[in-house]
């Protein structure tokens, strides 16, 4: 099976990809979306969102990275796909699934699910423009409101000759509600269409991954939010590893401070780590206590100091446990 680290705008940036691919056996990653409007974007935009382009389109640990584009104009999507390919992108992914209101209001992301013909035009333009050896894939939801629309949408992607398709098994209207997941539609898509598929949505552990594979008949899975809830989720899903214990998560939080300070977002670190806690709290009850100690801190150094103190307390408490 394959497990892919999916895109999350504003969350899974190159620093997080670097860290998570060091500790997981991911098959490839997808960047945050590059927003395409009516122009050819300068190189620095691609390098900012995918600095891995300067390393052979791989993370420092060697995991390939696809560049994701989001837009609705076939010509400019194709022009920017060409540019990403020229810069060395491992692959081009096209976002037709983002449910964010601002993106949809500007006719991007999931808004295109209402217009399968436009999806066809965008995918075909990009596939025709990019050299054949570079894969062009797409990411969709089941539809805007009606999951039955997925078949027409998938047909549009397949007819445009995309190399692969990720299906988030909810509609746009379904948001991220667990009750709205509909894996069985991916199985129906698989039976109707020959395009290689990746299943996405509600895979939080090994059992979920196996259930998704069993239901969909697809053995390639993409994880996004869960990869932040449980930092080693890739190995949990792929190899049935135990979830990372809390003390190792704390060590990872300290490693993340080094990534941010060393990287280009040191000034954003206080907000970034608090954002990560919003995910960790779903899997680790201890995260609530630690977040309470950090929430009022606004500078990097006090946060790092508090994390060190907290880690020392954990180690001291563990040392006092009876053998």
Curated annotation (Swiss-Prot):
Entry keyword annotation includes tRNA-binding: yes
Organism superkingdom: Bacteria
Cofactor(s) of this protein: FMN
Gene3D superfamilies (UniProt xref): Aldolase class I (3.20.20.70), Dihydrouridine synthase, C-terminal recognition domain (1.20.225.30)
Alphabetized InterPro entries for the sequence: Aldolase_TIM, DUS-like_FMN-bd, DUS_fam, DusC, DusC_C, tRNA_hU_synthase_CS
Protein role: Catalyzes the synthesis of 5,6-dihydrouridine (D), a modified base found in the D-loop of most tRNAs, via the reduction of the C5-C6 double bond in target uridines. Specifically modifies U16 in tRNAs.
Identification of the protein by name: tRNA-dihydrouridine(16) synthase
The species this protein was found in: Vibrio cholerae serotype O1 (strain ATCC 39315 / El Tor Inaba N16961)
């Amino acid at each position: 099976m394959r497990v892919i680290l999916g895109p999350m705008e504003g969350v899974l940036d190159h620093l997080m990809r670097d860290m998570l691919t060091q500790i997981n056996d991911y098959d490839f990653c997808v960047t945050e979306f590059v927003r395409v409007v009516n122009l050819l974007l300068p190189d620095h935009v691609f390098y900012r969102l995918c600095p891995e382009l300067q390393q052979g389109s791989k993370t420092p640990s060697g995991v390939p990275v696809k560049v994701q584009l989001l837009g609705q104009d076939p010509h400019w999507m194709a022009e920017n796909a060409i540019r990403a390919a020229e810069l060395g992108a491992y692959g081009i992914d096209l976002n037709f699934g983002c449910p964010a209101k601002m993106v949809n209001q500007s006719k991007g992301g999931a808004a295109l699910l209402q217009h399968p013909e436009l999806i066809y035009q965008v995918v075909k333009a990009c596939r025709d423009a990019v050299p054949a050896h570079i894969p062009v894939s797409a990411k969709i939801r089941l539809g805007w409101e009606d999951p039955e629309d997925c078949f027409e949408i998938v047909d549009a992607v397949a007819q445009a000759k995309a190399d692969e398709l990720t299906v988030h098994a909810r509609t746009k209207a379904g948001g991220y509600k667990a009750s709205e997941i509909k894996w069985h539609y991916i199985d129906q898509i698989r039976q109707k269409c020959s395009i290689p598929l990746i299943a996405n949505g509600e895979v939080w552990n090994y059992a979920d991954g196996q259930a998704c594979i069993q239901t969909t008949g697809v053995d390639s899975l993409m994880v996004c939010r869960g990869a932040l809830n449980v930092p080693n989720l890739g190995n949990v899903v792929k190899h049935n590893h135990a979830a990372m214990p809390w003390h190792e998560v704390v060590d990872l939080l300290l490693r993340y401070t080094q990534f941010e300070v060393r990287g280009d977002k040191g000034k954003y670190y206080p907000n970034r780590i608090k954002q990560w806690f919003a995910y960790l709290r779903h899997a680790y009850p201890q995260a609530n206590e630690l977040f309470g100690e950090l929430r009022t801190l606004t500078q990097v150094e006090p946060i790092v100091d508090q994390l060190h103190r907290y880690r020392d307390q954990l180690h001291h408490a563990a040392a006092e446990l009876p053998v």
